[in-house]
């Protein structure tokens, strides 16, 4: 990766940025002072963020934080009463822009629709009233299994408005993945649709799960955008017969609002919990202050609501009273440059995208980009995985015309935003992060808890809690401590390998665990492996991700077949597609006699991954069966 300075902020940009206004609000001289003070006192930082962003409370908080039970259990905005909907919708009602368009939406076939803030407010009240009529109450979990429709956002905010907890699920999940998450969360309701389209293929979303929903004992109601009738089904059209007048529920600032599942390397999916104050405060700072998002911006991020970025997008735009563009389907169909044409058409000023999208776009015919007018773009935010030099420069030069700053960020579902970012007051290097996010107390340590040297890799950690940090894991306090606060005792260990150069620029070098990320979507090996094992056609299986230039990782399944198994590779590919969705289809299935294991029978995915990537597997002295390595190596990609 090139280490030269490639972008410099202008004096005008610095002077007019929200970051400068925030620094002045805090009575500080510059970003260096902000960074230093917030590192030692994150409570001071978040108190100022809340006040600067004019976040509203029904009852003011008496104290910004309480960490008396230990840093992992830090509580925020003590005794405060609020609601995400209060800060994303209600507080805008007296503003002129409330009659303006909030969401522009396009279906894959090009059909357009839109909704104003005023209309949106009435619709979420109708849906919220219906939920209450059907017996849903504060604290109940209601899932969203929907594509990028306006109705998805209406349901999302309606659930929050009545104090229920929203559980967004990736619209590409198969039935097993959906049912497992519904059961972990003990969901009482689910919003879904009859169908959507992806690359001209009709996806029958409700059909994919309806025959398995009886496995969710807690489920009481299905809210369906479609015409199918049934015992538990409430059809979307019936929402229109309900009152559009509904008071927003007053919730404790720390009440659960959103559950986003993320996958680790072992065990069941982990439910990260966002609070009513946590996400909106984090987005107000990360995107509003640091990435300069304003009420006049138009936002586009083609992310599924099932991922953290979906909640992030909904909150960024609405909390600022801005406009957003959503689109059914994918960024490169039916037009190869659909994503950029959406920016051109709607004059998008602020977009968020992944390196995976750019790797796919940069190999297309350069003529496709020649006549695009992307002059409305003033900010490009990126995240999800580390950059390599060539795609970063392509984005900067071809799309941004070497003028638009690329706001690289790194964080994740567990922190509801970023730990590292690019500060608009400092120069940018290719693919780097020129600063840690204030209020995150970020550092790089070795496993002994010691700071690493310049350019040395170590674990990305947080020394203190953050307002947006997950409130434990849903119904799993032990796993929360074991996974995040015990690797290096009393530090949050994020699972990313990081380094810092002599100029203070930070870099990521991939995950320090075995989580597989495909085009920005994360999945744990155990989820893939369990699908194969339960078929009875495999004795053992190991799922690993091999680096891929286009989508981040290729999924490779190494299978020890069951006796008398005559199934082909396609059989196992189809199993994964059915249960987990097409996004996680294996790129290759290999059959082997044995898998490398330690003496306590732990499968060594690190060794398998290295062999398949044709790399040195390192120390094999702990292996029970080192002879298995050569067979794996013979299948190297």
PLM-predicted stretches and their roles:
Residues 161-237, 563:
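Structural core segment of the AMP-binding/adenylate-forming
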Residues 280-298, 308-349, 364-366, 441:
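Conserved AMP-binding/adenylation subdomain of ANL enzymes
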Residues 435-439, 450-484, 523, 537, ...:
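Conserved ATP/PPi-binding loop(s) of AMP-dependent carboxylate-activating enzymes
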Residues 319-322, 349-353, 362-428, 441:
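Gly/Ser/Thr-rich phosphate-binding loop
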Residues 33-36, 85-86, 99, 103-157, ...:
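Conserved AMP-binding/adenylate-forming core of the ANL superfamily
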Residues 99-101, 224, 240-261, 268, ...:
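Conserved pre-ATP/AMP-binding loop-to-beta segment of ANL
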Residues 170-195, 344, 351, 466, ...:
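AMP-binding/adenylate-forming catalytic core of the ANL superfamily
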Residues 113-118, 257-283:
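Conserved AMP-binding A3 loop
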